[in-house]
Amino acid sequence: MLLTIDVGNTNLTLGLYNGDQLGRHWRLATDHARMPDEYGLQFLGLLQNAGKTITDLTGIVLASVVPNLTGRVIHACQEYLKQEPLVVDTGVKTGIRIRYEDPRQVGADRVADAVAVLRLYGGPACVIDFGTATTFNAITKAGDYLGGAITAGVNLAAEALYTHAAKLPRMDLQRPPSVIGRNTVHAMQSGLLFGYVSMVEGMVARFRSELGSDMKVIATGGLAEVVAKETDVIDIISPWLTLDGLRIIWELNQ
């Protein structure tokens, strides 16, 4: 089995693949203070939870956008899972052409998303990944990754409001009863959710004007389903898109 690991700023996502089929998968909170031994023991526990041992693993592929954790996770894989992980970085075969001015600046998760979309859905496409940051990524029919746009994720925006506006409370992101909020919490929920949806709709329209009217829109990440319920511009929700991309990258490098 192949273990895929996506290390993000907020979540650490793992999945076990048997061929192209995703089996057990986990989304954990990223802990920036955790040491390599702690990660290693946690990974062993997850394998045990899935009824597997390290002898069942045929490989590990890793994407990380958290530099200070990358080495710790690699060490955990080496010492506890007895595997040298394939790390998505420059020099790794991806099957796409990255047209960024400096390809080294493209996050490994964005690369994995693009690889998965091109293989599973084809281009032209706009991939929206709702994470700590929300990214919009443009992929052509020919397999070129053109770049995209990066903005603060909705939870990050909510935290900024709470932190920097003294009278605004911390609240859960839920759909308010109406766009016009009748109290502070509903007003914040309206601004964050509906304002965010409007931003997504506007960005999709702008991407479509450059990629063409046949552009597909694929959404992934923790808030993809929440946003998709409020708009019709999202064609496909693919919750584990990044892990699918990591699996494909692994296959391309064997």
Please report, for each region that a protein language model flagged, where it lies by residue:
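Phosphate-binding/catalytic loop of phosphoryl-transfer enzymes
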Residues: Q83-V87, V92, I96-H164, L193-V204, ...
